[in-house]
Structures are given as C-alpha cells and as structure tokens.
C-alpha cells in the first residue's frame, strides 16, 4: 500500500488533500473521532493528526469538490441542516469540517437507516440524527435552530420544493443551500442538463441567488450540485 507523503490544505476550510508517495492524491478531512471510520474509508496519520479519506464516488459533496466546486460555504462552526442523511457518509465529513463549534442536524426518513446513522453520531457530539420526513419540517422545527446552510440529498421529484420549504423554516438570511439534484428522479425522459437548468430557474424565481450549477459525472452520473444563496 502506498504511504502518505504530505497533507496540504485546499481552498476550503478543513478540507485537505492527502498526497501519497506513488503520486496519487485523495481528498480527506481531519477525523473528529480518531480511531473510528464510518464507511470503510482509509484512516491516514500524518504529523500527529488522523485524517479520513473522503471518497468522491461515495459522497456527492466530495465529488463536487474534486470536480472544481467554487462555492462551498461549509466552514468551521457552521450550523447545517442535512436532509437525506442516510447512514452518515457525507454528514460525517461535514462533522469533521465544522468541528465541535458547529452542528449537523441530520434528517433521515428510514428507521432502518437511521440506526446506522445513530452509530456514527455516538462518536460525534456535533451530529444530531432526526427521524423525520423532510416534506414536513413543521414536525421537527422544535429540534432545529436557524442554520447557516441547508444541504439536501433526497432524490425526490419535488426535491427543490422540499428544499425551499425547509429554507423558509430554518435558513438564516444570507445563508446557503446546497442541493444534490438527481435528474432521473425528476424526469427520465429529459436531458439531465435541461432538468438542472429548470430546477435552478425554480430557485431563482423563488428569490434565491444562483451561485453555481455543477455536474457531478463521473462520480455521480446524471447528478448536479446546485449552490444558492438565500437573499
């Protein structure tokens, strides 16, 4: 197995590149819970710090960063509402990024899947799993404070509408929303790019400022990341 040669900072807060002696480079985050991995990712020790490899094929946010994402508003201390947390792959890396000063409110609909999420969160005091349906934020509004970012990955035909509805409840003014759009969940007959543009137009018409629309191929086929600012 190749050995770590150095770790360098990226343009984004608490996101790093691990460079190995065989010339390969991998995205990584500092492990908030040393000794524990989440989805079988490699743990890398360098300079007295443990990092977790961040697999771009397992995380849409990692894929977006590798693809050249320009706007990543997630920083140390950010408060995040994550819709569609699943078993915690991407939320755990966000947990690393925001550190203990931040919070990751992690909403998941499946009782089976949230059991896995709870196992992840027990080692991460800044993660707060919530068993709920993202279509009905009124049922978890007492559990979530106003947040800096709403991150959405729920693969529903009305994902954009669900995202905007949650933003009305929880997103601070001048906060950001990041939406992972799966075009095939919206319309299998249309060209994915046409769908991305249509979803961005919905957001713009609702008063959001479009910062970026980034296609995620080859890491996630027929997906795009849309980043908007709440004016």
Curated annotation (Swiss-Prot):
<keyword id="KW-0808">Transferase</keyword>
<dbReference type="InterPro" id="IPR029063">
    <property type="entry name" value="SAM-dependent_MTases_sf"/>
</dbReference>
<comment type="function">
    <text>Involved in pre-rRNA and tRNA processing. Utilizes the methyl donor S-adenosyl-L-methionine to catalyze the site-specific 2'-hydroxyl methylation of ribose moieties in rRNA and tRNA. Site specificity is provided by a guide RNA that base pairs with the substrate. Methylation occurs at a characteristic distance from the sequence involved in base pairing with the guide RNA.</text>
</comment>
<keyword id="KW-0698">rRNA processing</keyword>
<dbReference type="InterPro" id="IPR020813">
    <property type="entry name" value="Fibrillarin_CS"/>
</dbReference>
<dbReference type="GO" id="GO:1990259">
    <property type="term" value="F:histone H2AQ104 methyltransferase activity"/>
</dbReference>
<feature type="binding site">
    <location>
        <begin position="153"/>
        <end position="156"/>
    </location>
    <ligand>
        <name>S-adenosyl-L-methionine</name>
    </ligand>
</feature>
<keyword id="KW-0489">Methyltransferase</keyword>
<comment type="subunit">
    <text>Interacts with nop5. Component of box C/D small ribonucleoprotein (sRNP) particles that contain rpl7ae, FlpA and nop5, plus a guide RNA.</text>
</comment>
<comment type="similarity">
    <text>Belongs to the methyltransferase superfamily. Fibrillarin family.</text>
</comment>
<dbReference type="Pfam" id="PF01269">
    <property type="entry name" value="Fibrillarin"/>
</dbReference>
<dbReference type="GO" id="GO:0008033">
    <property type="term" value="P:tRNA processing"/>
</dbReference>
<dbReference type="GO" id="GO:0000494">
    <property type="term" value="P:box C/D sno(s)RNA 3'-end processing"/>
</dbReference>
<keyword id="KW-0694">RNA-binding</keyword>
<protein>
    <recommendedName>
        <fullName>Fibrillarin-like rRNA/tRNA 2'-O-methyltransferase</fullName>
        <ecNumber>2.1.1.-</ecNumber>
    </recommendedName>
</protein>
<feature type="binding site">
    <location>
        <begin position="133"/>
        <end position="134"/>
    </location>
    <ligand>
        <name>S-adenosyl-L-methionine</name>
    </ligand>
</feature>
<keyword id="KW-0819">tRNA processing</keyword>
<feature type="binding site">
    <location>
        <begin position="108"/>
        <end position="109"/>
    </location>
    <ligand>
        <name>S-adenosyl-L-methionine</name>
    </ligand>
</feature>
<dbReference type="GO" id="GO:0008649">
    <property type="term" value="F:rRNA methyltransferase activity"/>
</dbReference>
<feature type="binding site">
    <location>
        <begin position="89"/>
        <end position="90"/>
    </location>
    <ligand>
        <name>S-adenosyl-L-methionine</name>
    </ligand>
</feature>
<dbReference type="GO" id="GO:0003723">
    <property type="term" value="F:RNA binding"/>
</dbReference>
<dbReference type="InterPro" id="IPR000692">
    <property type="entry name" value="Fibrillarin"/>
</dbReference>
